[in-house]
């Protein structure tokens, strides 16, 4: 049966109340709730809100294609024997979209105000930057001022350097 799921980009698990997103290769403890349909939405406390938010926030056709195209990442197999597939969490999705727009605005207007991203330890900043870099490299080629950007990630710990090398 595993070969039937080889091309399954996302996996959603739910008991009707709690609903989590991952991939078929994601360990259970790394499945994550999608808590907002759109950036800025308030968290709902209604029963079954997680399921409805997941359906609207991930599985609407436009959003699903966007996640499938730009927010699923396969880690370099040089570093791991097993194929590692990573799907964005909702904060990474919205942060990378906002950062991309901020950078585009900064470049086009020449304001020099591209923005700053602050995230707590363990929130997935490295993956957020990978998703952002992918957006800038693949989805901004039609913006002459951006073209083919050079992207430099500066880290302050060996652990982050090793994590970034896997990207």
Annotate each language-model stretch with its function.
Residues 1-155, 159-167:
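ATP-dependent helicase/translocase motor core
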């Amino acid at each position: 049966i595993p070969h039937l799921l080889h091309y399954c980009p996302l996996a959603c698990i739910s008991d009707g109340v709690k609903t989590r997103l991952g991939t078929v290769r994601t360990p259970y403890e790394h499945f994550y709730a999608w808590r907002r349909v759109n950036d800025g939405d308030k968290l709902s406390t209604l029963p079954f809100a997680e399921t409805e938010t997941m359906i609207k926030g991930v599985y609407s056709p436009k959003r699903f294609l966007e996640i499938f195209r730009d927010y699923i990442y396969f880690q370099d197999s040089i570093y791991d024997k097993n194929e590692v597939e990573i799907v964005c969490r909702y904060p990474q999705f919205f942060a990378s979209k906002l950062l991309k727009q901020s950078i585009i605005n900064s470049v086009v207007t020449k304001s020099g105000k591209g923005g700053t991203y602050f995230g707590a330890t363990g929130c997935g900043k490295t993956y957020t930057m990978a998703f952002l870099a992918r957006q800038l490299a693949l989805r901004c080629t039609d913006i002459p001022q951006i073209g083919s950007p050079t992207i430099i990630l500066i880290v302050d710990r060996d652990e982050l350097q090793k994590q970034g090398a896997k990207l």
